[in-house]
Amino acid sequence: MSTDQPNGEPRRYKIDPDPAWDLYDEEDGVLSVELSWVPDPLAGRPPELVASPELVTALSAEGLTGYTTGAARGYYNEYTPAAEEGAAVPELVRLIVGEDPAADFSFVRSQGLTVSERALALLQARCQNLTVRPAG
């Protein structure tokens, strides 16, 4: 990976995380998601994202910027294959991404979810279902 684009700005990447749910609701600041399967450490349909507590700890330990966290909970409906197989519902943390294009994480509707090279390296090491494209 190259650190800079031809214009000298740091290279950014557009990512699409694991789309692990179709239904969600927010009540009293808690994002509730009906999981379709056991999600990747980063999952969602931007701008609504959830992460595993382990991923959030890693993001913080690396000093990555551009996000805050909030409450989230996942659940399976009775027809979800994961529920039928007896999979436990994972603990989730809401990942709220800001709009600062200079931060490691950024979400702007016209551009989608973009990340820095540092953030991408960490996500690629931990996530299996992550689509990556050059931003811009």
Predicted regions: what they are:
Residues M1-G136:
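Acidic (Asp/Glu-rich) sequence patches and key acidic residues
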